[in-house]
From Swiss-Prot:
Family designation: Belongs to the universal ribosomal protein uS13 family.
UniProt-annotated stretches for the region Disordered: 94-118
GO cellular component: cytosol; small ribosomal subunit
Name of the featured protein: Small ribosomal subunit protein uS13
Pfam family, one: Ribosomal_S13
Subunit structure: Part of the 30S ribosomal subunit. Forms a loose heterodimer with protein S19. Forms two bridges to the 50S subunit in the 70S ribosome.
UniProt function note: Located at the top of the head of the 30S subunit, it contacts several helices of the 16S rRNA. In the 70S ribosome it contacts the 23S rRNA (bridge B1a) and protein L5 of the 50S subunit (bridge B1b), connecting the 2 subunits; these bridges are implicated in subunit movement. Contacts the tRNAs in the A and P-sites.
The keyword Ribosomal protein belongs to this UniProt entry's keyword annotation: yes
Keyword annotations of the record: Ribonucleoprotein, Ribosomal protein, RNA-binding, rRNA-binding, tRNA-binding
Top-level lineage group: Bacteria
Biological process according to GO: translation
Length: 118
């Protein structure tokens, strides 16, 4: 298995699909990475030589991925919460942030129902 950005990339998949195993790399970005590295999208990872894998590593290194991206997202949310803005308050209360209704629905964000005591 090839190791890129600290992730074991599956050998038996095509390069474009295999790169999506990295957090922060989707189909569009993986196509751009393959194009920049000069690798065909339909080539499987096991068929690449070490120089091509190294060029993939170099191209992936230009983007914020994996732990750095997770840390950046959590720091952005923490900053909103520290500012005390509306979005930060919604994050702090574990409610939907983007204007969705909460009278009904929103169960994923709110968690399981809490029993009402009479």
């Amino acid at each position: 298995m090839a190791r890129i950005a600290g992730i074991n990339i599956p050998d038996h998949k095509h390069a474009v699909i295999a790169l999506t195993a990295i957090y922060g790399v989707g189909r569009t970005r993986s196509k751009a990475i393959c194009a920049a590295a000069g690798i065909a999208e339909n080539v499987k990872i096991k068929d690449l030589d070490e120089a091509q894998i190294e060029s993939l590593r170099e191209q992936v290194g230009k983007f914020t991925v994996e732990g750095d991206l997770r840390r950046q997202i959590s720091m952005n949310i923490k900053r909103l919460m520290d500012l005390g803005c509306y979005r930060g308050l919604r994050h702090r209360r574990s409610l939907p942030v983007r204007g969705q209704r909460t009278k009904t629905n929103a169960r994923t964000r709110k968690g399981p129902r809490k029993a009402i005591k009479k």
